[in-house]
A protein has these predicted regions:
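Long, compositionally biased, glycine/small-hydrophobic-enriched stretches that function as flexible linkers
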Residues: 1-160, 168-173, 184, 191-208, ...
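Alpha-helix-loop-beta-strand connector modules within alpha/beta enzyme cores
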Residues: 133-144, 192-229, 273-288, 310-325
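Hydrophobic faces of well-ordered beta-strands that scaffold small-molecule active sites
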Residues: 148-156, 176-180, 226-234, 253-257, ...
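Generic structural signal for hydrophobic
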Residues: 166-169, 246, 281-282, 320-321
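C-terminal basic regulatory modules in eukaryotic proteins
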Residues: 221-222, 247, 253
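Active-site capping/gating regions of soluble enzymes
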Residues: 270-281, 297-345
Length: 345
């Protein structure tokens, strides 16, 4: 079925949305957030935790408390790596153990240090590029199921119980498996570490949980001769960090929208729009498809009376996604409306 839409009106809507997106991008451009800074550290290889507290949080919190985050966490950690001959992970561990003060060692000028920082970032970026290439090769070899693709949700709270559910879903025809996050994870200002076996209404999004589920679905996909896509949720206070961890573990799709957190979680809109932009930059680079969250906006509203708000959001989301480098094929726009089927147009 093809909708006979007024193309001139669609063009006008896109132009209006583009103006809004341009204004947002001008605000985002010169700014960062603590989550963005933690993400950069994670991409440099700082992904361990001590007593459940991620090293990235320890470093960023330490710098922020001392008013020294303005130059960026990567600058301070990278400077220590260069001066002391340490890897980012080694330097971060020393900071966490109170064996190293990042502010107490000689400093390189930021411009002089930049090439070295780029070197430190290369292993993480290469890993993401390799994952993207591997996904493309596997999809070419195994193919995807016939359209429309079947999307199934699993979430027991225990990643070890999620795995057999996800594999069973794939064996019954699911092409895409989404693992819902535990209730309230969007309001945690850190990403839990390791495999988790207790969640509430969902399973924690962690790098290890991503790795476990990716491995399981790859094994099932090989057996079935179909590539099974893995989905998680990239929103809330750690939006860009989860994007980075998903990219490092070859997730295929992310729910990636700031507006739900603004409307329903009371998250600071300036912070979360900055976070959203960086998370979408990562998803664009990783070849990950994003889904926006317009269907969630309508859970407390009448779908017909407020349909125009969804359309407006979709146009704006499209323009913000393009500004972050996402290609049209990577954009999935939420549009699940709960409408009485007997309602006349």
């Amino acid at each position: 079925m093809k909708l006979q839409l007024d193309t001139s009106l669609v063009k006008e809507c896109r132009q209006a949305a583009g103006k809004i997106a341009d204004e947002v991008q001008r605000f985002i451009g010169p700014r960062s957030t603590q989550s963005v800074e933690r993400t950069v550290l994670r991409l440099m290889g700082v992904n361990d935790a001590i007593d459940g507290v991620p090293l990235a949080n320890i470093i960023v919190d330490n710098l922020a408390a001392r008013g020294e985050l303005g130059l960026g966490a990567a600058y301070w950690l990278g400077n220590a790596c260069k001066q002391l001959g340490l890897s980012p992970q080694e330097a971060a561990a020393k900071v966490a153990a109170n064996e190293l003060d990042l502010l107490a060692i000689p400093r390189e000028e930021p411009g002089v240090l930049r090439p070295f920082l780029q070197e430190l970032a290369q292993p993480g970026l290469r890993k993401i590029v390799d994952n993207r290439r591997q996904r493309e090769q596997m999809q070419q070899k195994l193919k995807m199921g016939p359209a429309p693709l079947l999307y199934v949700i699993v979430a027991t709270g225990d990643i070890m119980r999620d795995v057999p559910q996800a594999q069973a879903a794939a064996e019954q025809g699911a092409d895409i498996v989404a693992v819902i996050r535990t209730t309230g994870q969007s309001l945690l200002d850190y990403v839990p570490h390791g495999a988790t076996r207790e969640g509430f209404g969902g399973t924690y999004a962690t790098q290890e949980n991503f790795r476990i589920m990716r491995k399981a679905l790859d094994e099932t996909g090989e057996k079935l001769g179909r590539y099974i896509m893995l989905v998680n949720y990239c929103s809330g206070l750690c939006m860009p960090e989860i994007a980075a961890l998903g990219a490092l573990e070859r997730l295929d799709m992310m729910l990636n929208d700031a507006l739900y957190g603004i409307l329903f979680r009371d998250i600071n809109m300036e912070r979360t729009l900055i976070d959203q932009n960086f998370s979408r930059v990562i998803n664009a680079y990783a070849g990950i498809i994003i889904n926006s969250g317009e269907d969630n906006y309508l859970t407390t509203s009448d779908a017909v009376a407020e349909a125009h708000t969804v359309t407006a959001s979709q146009f704006i989301n499209e323009q913000l996604a393009l500004a972050a480098g996402l290609s049209p094929w990577q954009m999935g726009l939420g549009h699940a409306f709960e409408i009485d089927p007997d309602l006349e147009d």
